[in-house]
A protein has these predicted regions:
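Short, well-structured N-terminal submotif of metal-dependent ribonuclease cores
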Residues: 1-40, 53-66, 138-139
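Short loop->beta-strand "edge-of-pocket" segments that line small-molecule binding or catalytic clefts
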Residues: 37-39, 71, 113
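Short acidic, glycine/proline-enriched helix-loop-strand junctions
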Residues: 64-68, 72-79, 83-84, 122-139
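Acidic, PIN/NYN-like endoribonuclease modules and their adjacent C-terminal/linker elements
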Residues: 1-3, 103-139
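Structured helix-beta-strand junction loops
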Residues: 34-35, 70-71, 92
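Active-site neighborhoods of divalent-metal-dependent phosphate/nucleic-acid chemistry enzymes
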Residues: 73-113, 117
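Alpha-helix capping/helix-boundary segments
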Residues: 10-11, 44, 82, 102, ...
Length: 139
């Protein structure tokens, strides 16, 4: 069974109804039908909380957390081992540390696919599966 790792950009595309939101919704639907699994790293979850809170939107962190729990999306802890691997991944591919946590999860298995709208992780693409969401249209 495929496991999709949503990074913060993918989840925010869904919340904000931006380019690629339909694909993220499809992935979550496959998860709820037990045809795929969806996970997110605790670090990426923290980014989502920070961004939503900073926007001052009507959508609260508690509501988003409730959605994750209701959908059964697992938040994977940032253990010391994962943090060390993410640091090395960040150095190897020259990607941001927080982004490296999603990449690190994708390296766990050949059945893992990172879903992102962040093209900064592109250097890791030759060594793992990454599904890039479309870029936002220019305004």
């Amino acid at each position: 069974m495929l496991t999709y790792i949503l990074d913060s950009s993918a989840y925010l595309r869904l919340i904000d109804r931006e380019a690629g939101d339909g694909r993220v919704a499809d992935i979550i639907e496959h998860h709820t039908q037990q045809r795929a699994r969806v996970i997110i790293s605790a670090i990426q979850w923290g980014e989502i909380v920070k961004i939503i809170t900073s926007r001052g939107r009507n959508l609260t962190v508690a509501e988003i957390a409730h959605d994750l729990r209701t959908l059964g999306i697992a938040v994977i802890a940032a253990t010391a081992d994962r943090a060390e691997r993410a640091a090395l991944i960040g150095l190897k591919y020259k990607i941001a540390y927080a982004d490296a946590f999603g990449v690190e999860l994708a390296f766990d298995s050949p059945d893992h696919v990172l879903v992102t709208a962040d093209y900064g992780v592109k250097p890791a693409e030759p060594d793992m599966k990454i599904e890039f969401l479309p870029t936002k249209p220019k305004q």
